[in-house]
Amino acid sequence: MDSNENKKNGGDSLELNIINNNNDNNNNNDNNNNSTEEHIESVEQSIKEFNNVANELETEFRDYLVETHKNDVNNIKNDIEAPPSGEFEPGGGAEDEDFKLRNYFKQSKVDAIQNGGKLKKMGVSFKNLTVIGKGADQSVVSDLATPFTFLISKLNVKNWFKKSKPSTFDILHDVSGFCKDGEMLLVLGRPGSGCSSLLRTISNQTGSYVDVLGSVTYGGIDQKKWDKYKAECIYVPEEDTHYPTLTVRETLEFALKCKTPSNRLPNEKKRTFRSKIFNLLLGMFGMVHQAETMVGNEFVRGLSGGERKRITIAESMVSASSINCYDCSTRGLDAASALDYAKSIRIMSDTLHKTTIASFYQASDSIYNLFDRVLILEKGRCVYFGPVGLAKQYFIDMGFECEPRKSTPDFLTGVTNPQERKVRPGFTVPESSAEFEEAWKQSEIYAQSCQEQREYEKLIEIEQPSIDFIQEITEQKSKSTSKSSPYTTGFFVQVIALTIRNFQIIWGDKFSLISRYSSVLVQAPIYGSVFFAMSNSIDGAFTRGGAIFSSILFNALLSEQELSITFTGRRILQKHKTYAMYRPAALHFAQIITEIPIIMIQVFLFSIVTYFMFGLDSSGSKFFINCFTLIGFTLATNNLYRLAGNLTPSVYIGQNIMNVLFLTMMTFTSYIIPYHQMPVWFGWYHYCNPFSFAFRALMGNEFNGLKFDCIEDAIPKGEFYQNETFTPYRSCATTAAEPGQLYFTGERYLEKSFGWEIKPSTQGFIAYNICIVYGFWILFIICNCIVLNIIDWTSGGFTCKVYLKGKAPKMNDVENEKQQNLLVQQATNNMKESLSMPGGLFTWQHMYYSVPIGGNTMKLLLDDIQGWIKPGQMTALMGSSGAGKTTLLDVLAKRKTTGQVQGTTLLNGKPLEIDFERITGYVEQMDVLNPALTVRETLRFSAKLRGEPTISLEEKFKYVEQVLEMMEMKHLGDALIGDLETGVGISVEERKRTTIGVELVAKPHILFLDEPTSGLDAQSSYNIIKFIRKLADAGMPLVCTIHQPSSVLFEHFDRILLLAKGGKTVYFGDIGEKSKTLTSYFQRHGVRECSDSENPAEYILEACGAGRHGKSVVDWPQAWKESPEYQSICQELKELQVTGSSYASIHVDNGKPREYATSLTYQTIEVYKRLNLIWWRSPGYSYGTFIQSALVGLINGWTFYNLQDSANDMNQRIFFIFNVTMLGILLMFLVLPQFITQQDYFKRDYASKFYHWLPFALSIIVVELPFVLVSGTIFFFCSFWTAGLNSDASTNFFFWLIFMLFLFYCVGFGQAIGAVCINITVALNLLPVLIIFLFLFCGVLVIPDQIPHFWKWVYHLNPCTHFLEAMVTNVLKHVNVVCTTDDLIKFVKPSSFSTCSDYAFEFLNGSNHSVSGSVQSLGGDNCGYCLYKNGEEYYSKLGWSYDNRWRGFGIIAGYFVLNIFLVVLFVFLTRKGKR
């Protein structure tokens, strides 16, 4: 029996596992007596490591068992009657590190068995697994030309008869293996080897692949039947996706609420269970003190990267799955924390029979020895699978040599890399992955593995663990959950948990909520004052419609932000779906519950102000009906925007769709076009529109029972007609009144003006429309639930590379593989020739950094840090996660923009100059890369703008190619960087390499690197460290934070700055040959001796107490202050500050520092070219704008089809142009996300002094203009002539010209809003506040004469006013009005007057007033009054003049220039992101 089998069997009996532990280990050694001496030492080291873990964690439990079971330790009853369980209480009298994890898990197992629980012993077996992916040539970068090339290819007759078979390649090729329950399988391989794909395939996430061949079984259950148990085999990706505004407690407690099982211990309440597990997780990962800290992300301050990784792992553990697939889960963790994490998994696997499959980059020997088996992949092919103790010797026997102090995992992955491996003399080794695979399949270990797999599968057939597994799964589910459901808790419980979480998210981002309500409170008085105290006259009837219509628009515009919010949580939803935490529909119901009180408050805040300021009916019932209707309408609109987000892959497409819907719904509300005047082909849309039913309900509610008086405005009008004898012969100036009546009712106004059927009951009409509004809400809820369950726009962690057309490399080609290896070797060898790095001396002394944590309290993050870097030196910055390494780098690199920094930093003995950020490179931990560019384009952009101007462009590009080759990215040069959320682009580790490349190609003089090897495999890390070592040798000083350095990597560094938690120095000084100087310092303070085979980096972290279980009796910061090394450092630092000027100056141009390497003109050209390329490669954004303009143009044109010369058509012309105005206003919402996204990338570039802020501000305005020009022209051609606005060429040209200028203005206005706001949510709250002044005060919703005097200045300053005046007068100038019968105001003449004209003579020609229009005879005594003779009379009543057209054009042009100034100003003010 081998060591792995013993390890597994040890988990079957609690007592035997503990009492016989040493016997098992002895057996392990006996079983390997036939191995080589080196192999024996390896196994012994593995056993020693494991025993250390076991002894450390189970001492208390062993003692207790010996005393309790001394009579019969092998009696199973004693196993059941183990000591009572106790909950771990972190911080409760003992430190977190004292918690005995194995004790807890074993006791939990005993308790579960005692209460009838079953162990979920589910191993996994996979045979002949081949995963087929889409060939690289099948995915090309999309741009604006893509639709045309596609259309041309389809029109080519030759292509009709070709059967093009899409190219594919094997991501995995014929891979077999297994992992028994209670075992741990380590998957190793270089990037692109298929490690992640293997883990995804095992966890049944195969939707991204073309095909999957072979079989995967889980404890005897095949993959097809496993879907309903998907939560029992989870895939944990390497990236961390969490809601940044939630705290650690809120994040984990939510997961626990969704995964709380029903079969808990007797009398154990859910709250107790969750508290116990929560405390356990905090103790396991040493996060007790961070429980109330926000998780954060790259934009929200919170946990450190390593701490965030721990939360990701803890969240996955909450799922309590049987099989766990961890993909590079130690990324961002320091070596001690990574080892603690691996130990925890080992203990869980042993005690709870968890099956663990993990892929680690840069795993140490300590971690490696905790695993049972290892599977090594190279280019998708298995080159080894078997016990971890035999892997190293297998490759040594093959002919490879392992360097001293090189970890086994590094050696195993390095043998496949010609640049890293070393071949023993006299041996011939495989060259390609296919040759490695062939050698493996011919080995004896392969035959043994196949035999063992067959035996394991037979054992599964006999034992049938799936029976106990299914029974346990069933018992874990709540009573409200069906047996076939993969979810643990019921739908109702999920909704409650999600609702609480949603409120916590909102509370965590209080600023957005406050800005939302502030927006309401600012806008409500403005709306109220515009329609203040409306009278019960004809004008009051019309303005009531405008007031109610504006109330609808206000709440609809606030719903715009729901679209962007929908996209922020997609990846988190996808992750939780794979964990089976909750149904997507539950998330939507929780969002509904959450938004109801928020929207109720929003509507009441708005209505309580506007309703009574409007002067609407003061009846209490009518007020509450008004609020109730608006609440239902806003809920429906919110869900409509959310539906658009769930149905579309990007925010730009969703925004375009909603802009089209918004304009059409607004148009067919009945306010702009009355229902009875809508064209037949669009009449149906009135009934598919929540806007229209809300408007009908609100209008019916207000006008019910109202009576409008029109004595003063009756027709004919004048003193002559004031005699009571003429009263029967006058009529109200509206079609709603009967001839001879000087009043009209609200119900009749609605019937005549809008064509609505109010009878038989107005109350029934109101109730019917309110029900329809809420019906829309319910309909959208159902649609969202269906869409969320069916459509998934995320990639599930899978990335698909896309290349420039014709640039895709060959996949898994042996010759191509060999050629790539040769290029890397040549680039590495030749790199030294091109390196010449004049560096400088950089010193820092007494550095303190503190941040405010509430009130006047400051938290100290860096405490008296000092040191230096000299030319030619590599300094490692190390410490446990959260010790302040990144913070220190930010401070030294002058990246901090918040908090207080104290201390002295000098360059060559002088204060830092303005060019410091430019001449220093800073590789940040977060990879902020523009997704629309390729890797080569990104690196070239950095080289062009940051390289010295004296270096030719050809030399810069040549250096870029060398960096690409050295970093093994030559084949990725033309690959799109892409976006992880959509799964299109390069992988996480490839992004890291690109981020490093961006800094390296600039040839910085000082280099700061924050975790440059985090998430990279050993070979990539080795290449990068070796490369920056060459940089140091060439004269560059650099500081590099590093979490998990191997012994080989650590030896490349000259000095180390070691930090303890709290930002205090533990050690700063030389490392020494073989780290002797460093280790001797710690040994002098009582730490054990570091062996020659031990990793010094792990040794010093262990010594200073890093990690969860780390302990140290020495106060290392204090010991450092009292050490002679510290005194020597202080003295040398003083000398360096004095003699620093003797170091070579790093400035050029006669020593004058330059903030930027290139001129402002050159920067502007390059930035514009890059932005233009981004826009060109954003067809979703650009074509979305074009399609939006075409659809809106067509709908607008056919809605106002072939307008005639009637008086009503004069109104329709006005509203046609008003819709044109609204198109421009909605365009502002479209440009916001794109601008804010690009501004985030600009801030990263600006921090490194790529370019000045002015080129970005100007370029991002100019780059939009051609696309806006095309969009506006499309709209013009689709709507102008269709609507019947055709006139002479000059009129048409002026219409197009001022329309283009207005769109330019709108884009600039939207960008100015984006520039001043910190995020998209705030921008979407602010924008409605500002656009209210545009559409509300333009003279359409409220005619100029009725605008309150206080707001007249807004009307005159409003650019929309001048735009509408110019457009309307331009269109109506030469139109003669011919009234139809329906247009006429009908009245009866007295019989004493012979004609209608005689009766109306005083009215039309009176000396005291001038009246436009004309009177017609309708036969007999019936007369009709036409309001206007021509278009000029129509717009002159608004105070507009045709002569003001070009003045309006100039005013809009002036506003456009003002917007440019504002964009430039706000970009300048916000150019530095908060750090």
Swiss-Prot record:
ATP binds at residues 879-886. GO terms for molecular function: ABC-type transporter activity; ATP binding; ATP hydrolysis activity. Residues 507-753, 1180-1404 form the ABC transmembrane type-2 domain. SUPFAM superfamilies: P-loop containing nucleoside triphosphate hydrolases. GO terms for cellular component: membrane. Belongs to the ABC transporter superfamily. ABCG family. PDR (TC 3.A.1.205) subfamily. This is ABC transporter G family member 15. The gene is abcG15.
